[in-house]
């Protein structure tokens, strides 16, 4: 029997992919003699079979016979956590606690509308988890604990948030032994290290400042490197993910961390997140020399006006050059963009799309684009919340997982799922299919970038409008899921096929056919190219093109090895 079970939304069967927050809290309880256990979504099977997934999850939780069940919540899985908590409460009757970012922000609304959730714990829990959980186990819950939200005489009581932990070095090391014994333990991935917390910036679409109060904190360089050494000694970890929204804010501490990393007795690699205006060539050199291999950068918009409106305030001059410099150091770069801001114009979407195409042409840049969502705890949500309307369907936050099965929750409790709420503008309506267009762009990158050159840069959005018009027959089939639309268009992209008579039509046709068929030989379709030609970035278009050259038929296979390096294999057939 376990006294506490923490349920997490981790969807990969690897204990080193587990959320650090619940692991830390479980570690603290375990060190105090309270048996704790982690159960992740990954251990419940595939959510594609939602009924089986839910039944397995509830069964595994109940098998532990816990006295308390705590659910770690994010916006992408709140509906699933609520549905599972309802079933667990019905079977066990034990106290149900919600925590994590989503529950934290809508704690009052959750307790007002969801009777089977007993408590919500807000803020940093390292100093409050033991006092509250131990009192609850004794049957005498301490309702004075900071960060606790609970019901009393029909009212919702919200205690003051816990004070932020000033010295993050005092937080204990995670004990991964609390994870299930049957969970795989692959340390050869980005082993997570909580290096710090908080972002001092105030972007209107982001809720990070709500959690941490815009207070930037970083563990000491010595502690960060000690965690790397410890996890190498215990688990053989060599590749690390530095978990922090803005790791590079304090350049002096970052440089000292890099100096100590280089003194480790093993070759360590790591990745982090940053702002472009918080890195320069000197810092890039230092980080790359110390093992940095991947960096995540939120750019969000290519419009100077929108940069100001969303309070991101990035200077866009030099963005391409800075990212080109990162690539010159053999670093992997992921950039994030948002489209569909309430005040955004078609010209500003074109500016963003133009910047995206420029970055893609650099090669080696991964691009993410997200539809603007109105999340509680953000300034944008506060400004527009009275003008939002429920629009349950596909969301960038959830995809389609559990949406149909949790329809009653969405219908009855719209305040809990604001990412399904829509602020309607003419442009946001026009951009409904933009994610499908972007999927086609990224999967046929070379072809789409070539076609983009046929449009004026300041009206690049017209390329999207033409894509929608040519593929309208698929996009207007309401019964199709987004994934089904993507698959059909990938099989028969009428936008690409509309460029008949283009000088590069033969190459476009070959590239399209190879991407569609993946293995040209299996379809009996031979490309018309007469030389071995790379027609698109290898990391995205990896099929098996067969090319006719003077020496005969050759099979050329492009693939990525386990370190992310491009490999080319040529075999005579």
Model-found features: residue ranges?
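Radical SAM [4Fe-4S] cluster-binding motif and immediate context
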Residues: 169-334, 339-341, 354
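A short, glycine/small-residue-rich beta-strand->loop->alpha-helix junction that serves as a flexible
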Residues: 11-20, 73-78
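Glycine-rich beta-alpha loop elements in corrinoid/cobalamin-binding modules
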Residues: 28, 37-164, 377
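Residue-level recognition of beta-strand->loop/alpha-helix junctions
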Residues: 8, 38-45, 72, 210, ...
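C-terminal accessory regions of radical SAM enzymes
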Residues: 4-14, 149-152, 347-496
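Structural recognition of alpha->loop->beta junctions
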Residues: 110-127, 289-294, 354-369
């Amino acid at each position: 029997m376990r006294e506490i079970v923490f349920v997490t939304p981790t969807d990969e069967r690897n204990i080193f992919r587990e959320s650090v927050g619940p692991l830390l809290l479980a570690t603290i309880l375990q060190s105090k003699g309270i048996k704790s256990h982690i159960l992740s979504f990954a251990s419940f099977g595939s959510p594609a079979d939602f009924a089986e997934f839910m039944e397995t999850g509830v069964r595994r939780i109940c098998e532990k016979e816990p006295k308390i069940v705590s659910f770690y919540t994010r916006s992408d899985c709140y509906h699933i956590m609520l549905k599972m908590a309802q079933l667990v409460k019905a079977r066990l009757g034990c106290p149900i606690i919600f925590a994590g970012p989503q529950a934290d922000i809508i704690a009052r609304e959750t307790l007002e509308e969801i009777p089977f959730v007993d408590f919500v714990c807000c803020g940093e829990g390292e100093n409050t988890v033991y006092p509250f959980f131990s009192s609850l186990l004794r049957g005498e819950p301490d309702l004075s604990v900071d960060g606790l939200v609970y019901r009393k005489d029909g009212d919702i009581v919200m205690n003051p948030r816990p004070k932020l932990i000033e010295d993050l070095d005092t937080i204990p090391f995670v004990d991964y032994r609390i994870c299930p014994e049957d969970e795989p333990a692959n340390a050869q991935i980005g082993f997570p290290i909580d290096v710090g917390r908080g972002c001092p910036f105030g972007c209107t679409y982001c809720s990070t400042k709500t959690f941490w109060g815009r207070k930037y904190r970083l563990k000491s360089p010595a502690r960060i490197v000690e965690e790397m050494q410890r996890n190498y000694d215990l688990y053989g970890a060599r590749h690390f993910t530095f978990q922090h929204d803005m790791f590079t804010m304090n350049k002096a501490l970052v440089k000292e961390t890099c100096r100590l990393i280089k003194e480790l007795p093993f070759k360590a690699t790591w990745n982090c997140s940053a702002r472009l205006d918080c890195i320069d060539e000197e810092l890039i050199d230092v980080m790359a020399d110390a093992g940095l291999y991947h960096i995540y950068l939120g750019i969000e918009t290519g419009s100077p006006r929108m940069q100001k409106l969303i309070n991101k305030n990035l200077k866009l001059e030099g963005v391409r050059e800075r990212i080109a410099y990162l690539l010159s150091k053999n670093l992997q770069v992921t950039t994030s963009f948002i489209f569909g801001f309430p005040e955004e114009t078609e010209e500003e979407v074109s500016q963003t799309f133009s910047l995206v195409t420029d970055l893609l042409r650099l090669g080696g840049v991964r691009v993410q684009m997200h539809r603007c969502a109105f999340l509680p705890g953000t300034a944008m949500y506060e400004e527009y919340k009275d003008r939002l309307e429920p629009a349950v369907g596909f969301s960038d936050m959830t995809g389609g997982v559990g949406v149909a099965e949790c329809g009653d929750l969405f219908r009855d409790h719209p305040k809990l799922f604001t990412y399904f709420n829509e602020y309607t503008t003419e442009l946001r309506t026009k951009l409904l299919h933009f994610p499908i267009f972007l999927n086609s762009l990224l999967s046929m990158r070379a072809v789409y970038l070539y076609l983009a050159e046929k449009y004026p840069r300041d009206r690049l959005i017209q390329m999207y409008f033409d894509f929608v018009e040519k593929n309208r027959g698929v996009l207007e089939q309401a019964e199709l899921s987004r994934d089904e639309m993507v698959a059909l268009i990938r099989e028969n992209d009428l936008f690409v096929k509309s460029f008949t008579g283009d000088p590069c039509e033969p190459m476009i046709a070959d590239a399209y056919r190879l991407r569609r068929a993946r293995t040209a030989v299996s379809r009996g379709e031979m490309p018309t190219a007469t030389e071995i030609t790379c027609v698109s970035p290898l990391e995205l278009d990896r099929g098996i093109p067969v090319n006719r050259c003077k020496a005969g038929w050759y099979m050329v296979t492009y693939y990525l090895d386990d370190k992310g390096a491009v490999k080319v294999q040529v075999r005579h057939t």
